Curated annotation (Swiss-Prot):
Gene that encodes the chain: fliI
Reaction(s) catalysed by this chain's protein: ATP + H2O + 4 H(+)(in) = ADP + phosphate + 5 H(+)(out)
Organism: Buchnera aphidicola subsp. Schizaphis graminum (strain Sg)
PROSITE patterns assigned: ATPASE_ALPHA_BETA (PS00152)
Descriptive protein name: Flagellum-specific ATP synthase
Positions bound to ATP: 194-201
């Protein structure tokens, strides 16, 4: 009996060991399959800023490479991406500081069976909601690494213009002045034109918290690191972050990473749009995205044509912006892009000019209002929504136009009014503006903690003119 039990036990033990062996072999096969087939490499011959020139390496544009460097006697790698060619040279743009590289250092290209090279896969998933990530999808919030089922490559998805659904619905932004006077449609692309210190970040935070949208994607491109944290913790808040995805590429990272962050934020918005969600995309700022494109283009030897910007930059902005909007059979992406202007007197710098021409409207922030403590500091006279007449009632449109007329009349004659030189009865429109000016000012101002729905905004506008 004991011999039989011992024999059975040995048999079971052998089966378990054999099963373990099979599992180990299977695991080893997976690891072998994931190994690179080859590591091709070239030699570094020149470094100019973040631009690297390499010989002996053939790779398509967009390929991810690894450059050796020596720091404290240790050989480490930095990441770089192929951005161009020049005769027998391959041009790479470094994603990190080039400290520690040396002439003749090896530059590796990792190749696989089914792909020529690694171009960088970025995670896409509903798990991204509530997270703060960098341009590669790596966590910046100290939480666990993402492990989504879906990935994307950073490429531009061209939308057939005949597949774009018309803008017919009003988007409730929760901001009274915008809802009533610069009404935005679902799927519209709007520029927020502002110089520094005018409350741009506060306005964006209010939009992110109060806008009626299923998902909010926020791209912080080229901002100061301190401002990124301040925006997330103090302006957006935990409630706003819960339905948002924040992609941050601060000013101290490589221009190429800033470009990829803008594209990644747009890719996430496209992902949720395909899931039939109404997406709000906020990008701060489109100007810094253009500056990053300029840095890469100038490194490649392109000639500047307007205020230091090469011509290729002006084609990159429409490619990014045109990915948003409405599409048939899917949801929508309503996008707000901040555009930094040098001054209100001369806003027609090349980036501001191209943005005005391709966007569906613009909201201008005024330094005059900001200095008076008037927030949000929206310059109603110079702001416009191109789709507004098509999505609101005729009554609201006429009231909004008359409101703007009163504001413009008062502002043009402000100095005369302040010194008492204006004679009452000279201009009936100005008389009306002077009479209700405190009401107009109160309507345009809104506390950061205050939310004003579209219906209540229209009702308050209507009450002014009863």
């Amino acid at each position: 009996m004991e011999g039989t039990m011992s024999s059975c036990f040995r048999g079971m033990l052998m089966k378990l060991r054999f099963s373990e062996l099979l599992n180990n072999i299977s695991s080893f096969e997976k690891k072998v399959n994931n190994l690179s087939d080859i590591f091709s490499y070239g030699c570094l011959i020149s470094v100019n800023g973040l631009l690297l020139e390499v010989i002996g390496l053939t790779a398509p544009i967009g390929s991810r490479c690894y450059v050796e460097r020596i720091i404290d006697g240790k050989i480490l790698n930095i990441s770089a991406e192929v951005v161009g060619f020049k005769k027998e040279k391959t041009l790479l743009f470094s994603l990190e500081e080039t400290y520690g590289v040396f002439p003749g250092t090896r530059v590796f290209l990792k190749c696989f069976k089914n792909t020529y090279s690694i171009t960088g896969k970025i995670p896409l998933s509903t798990e991204l909601l509530g997270r703060v990530l960098d341009s590669k999808g790596r966590p910046l919030d100290g939480r666990s690494q993402l492990n989504p089922k879906f990935f994307t490559f950073l490429k531009s998805n061209v939308v057939n213009p005949l597949n774009r659904k018309p803008i017919t619905e009003v988007l409730d932004t929760g901001i009274r002045a915008i809802n009533a006077l610069i009404t935005v449609g679902r799927g519209q692309r709007i520029g927020i034109f502002s110089s520094s210190g005018l409350g741009k970040s506060i306005l964006l935070g209010m939009m992110a918290k109060y806008t009626k949208a299923d998902v909010v994607i926020i791209g912080l491109i080229g901002e100061r690191g301190r401002e990124v944290k301040d925006f997330i913790e103090n302006i957006l808040g935990s409630n706003g972050l819960s339905r948002s995805v924040v992609i941050a590429a601060p000013a101290d990272v490589s221009p190429l990473l800033q470009i990829e962050a803008a594209s990644y934020a747009t890719s996430i918005a496209e992902y949720f749009r395909k899931k039939n969600k109404h997406v709000l995309l906020i990008m701060d700022s489109l100007t810094r995205y253009a500056m990053a494109q300029r840095a890469v283009s100038l490194s490649l030897g392109e000639l500047p044509v307007s205020k230091g910007y090469p011509s290729s930059v002006f084609s990159k902005i429409p490619i990014l912006v045109e990915r948003t909007g409405n599409t048939d059979n899917y949801g929508s992406i309503t996008s707000f892009y901040t555009v930094l202007t040098e001054s209100e007197e001369d806003p027609q710098d090349p980036i501001a000019h191209i943005c005005r021409s391709i966007l569906d409207g613009h909201i201008v922030l005024s330094r005059h209002y900001a200095e008076l403590g008037h927030y949000p500091a929206i310059d109603i006279e110079n702001s416009i929504s191109r789709v507004m007449p098509n999505i609101i009632s005729k009554k609201q449109y006429s009231q909004a136009c008359y409101f703007k007329k009163l504001i413009a009349s008062y502002q043009r004659n402000r100095d005369l009014i302040n010194i008492g030189a204006y004679l009452k009865g000279t201009d009936s429109t100005l008389d009306h503006a002077i009479k209700i000016w405190p009401i107009l000012e109160r309507f345009l101002q809104q506390k950061q903690s205050e939310k004003s729905s579209y219906l209540s905004s229209c009702e308050e506008l209507n009450q002014i003119f009863i």
